[in-house]
Amino acid sequence: MAAFRAAHRLLGHILRNESSAGLVTQRWSSSAAVASVPKSSDPKPHAQPDKRKPKTGILMLNMGGPETLDDVHGFLLRLFLDKDLMTLPAQSKLAPFIAKRRTPKIQEQYSKIGGGSPIKKWTEQQGEGMVKLLDELSPATAPHKYYIGFRYVRPLTEAAIEEMERDGVERAIAFTQYPQYSCSTTGSSLNAIYRYYNAKGTQPKMKWSVIDRWPTHPLLIQCFADHIQKELNMFPADKRGEVVILFSAHSLPMSVVNRGDPYPQEVGATVQKVMERLGFSNPYRLVWQSKVGPMAWLGPQTDESIKGLCQRGKKNILLVPIAFTSDHIETLYELDIEYAQVLAKECGVENIRRSESLNGNPLFSKALADLVLSHMKSSEICSKQLSLRCPMCVNPVCGEAKSFFTKQQQQ
């Protein structure tokens, strides 16, 4: 999953009919090992234990990923039923059919990366580091408590909201874990919050505000740059300067881009800031992965770019997942296995590596804490960008959700 942004990042895998043969199961790069996934299916939203009543609740929004192979079908079913992500004819009937048909294929892919997605594990670790820092930096708004709200797997966004209400949270911050905004990822998560209250016909007990995008936050940029430099240093010294950096993000259909989705521009802004931080040390390109179907999508595609570079004698390549902060199937399977192992061998790549995702980097938790702290100090409900609908938006719920959040009043 449009990653139609991150949700379509995964959609690329879900709809793909071709499989790669001869895959090896271990992580190819020494810099980012695949973590084992706990085999749990707790139906309750996850929040860290804390005896104190939380004053500020931070809802960490993401699409999520199946922790176990048994979770895959439910994940796919919720994904295909999400009308913010895609609209299908007779969606309530077609979605279960597609989910059932695709489950074995996607289970096979997850089995090659350890049996499930590590995204919940990383989100927990990031959240714990974030609230610990916030309690130290902002005692006036403490205790702080993080909650995880996934769109397609437990803990679901709606269940997390219920947990926050029961905890008596006074101030709720909807904090997207997508640095770059897209209507079908961050937008879908925010729509889910609005739909929750709209279905109940009640106003929130909590006062909501939103961190809806952060593509150029200085600490985010530093994290990316540090991870890239670390991986560049692993290339042979005589090849290091000619390594081509391919920043890879999930592609979007041009029909979505042409409606005015800001995702491509925001991803580009992240890339520009990262390369500035690196002093433009290497040639680079922004490329797009997970294209689905015959329609026009943002390009060039990551796999085609690898092929094209090799044909032109550029055979030292560093892949950088620039729109993904935590490892999941698109980094661990698509980038690490399909591209860095299978495709690279076919193309005759000399050296190919993948920059480690931000995962458990303490500096990244510091970035998250800084974003929340700055947001609370600003007293802003959301960014000015969030109040603006895409010029050619076709989803009326987007307008209703934006109105819901912009009308929230902070105490």
UniProtKB/Swiss-Prot annotation:
GO terms for molecular function: 2 iron, 2 sulfur cluster binding; ferrochelatase activity; metal ion binding. This is Ferrochelatase, mitochondrial. Catalyzes the ferrous insertion into protoporphyrin IX. It comes from the Eukaryota. It is a peripheral membrane protein. Gene3D superfamilies: 3.40.50.1400. GO terms for cellular component: mitochondrial inner membrane; mitochondrion. The active site is at H217, D370. [2Fe-2S] cluster binds at C183, C390, C393, C398. It catalyses: heme b + 2 H(+) = protoporphyrin IX + Fe(2+). Its main location: mitochondrion. Coiled coil: none annotated. Homodimer. Homotetramer. Protoporphyrin IX binds at R102, Y110, S117. Its cofactor is [2Fe-2S] cluster. Pathway: Porphyrin-containing compound metabolism; protoheme biosynthesis; protoheme from protoporphyrin-IX: step 1/1. Belongs to the ferrochelatase family. Keywords: 2Fe-2S, Heme biosynthesis, Iron, Iron-sulfur, Lyase, Membrane, Metal-binding, Mitochondrion, Mitochondrion inner membrane, Porphyrin biosynthesis, Transit peptide. InterPro entries: Ferrochelatase, Ferrochelatase_AS, Ferrochelatase_C, Ferrochelatase_N.
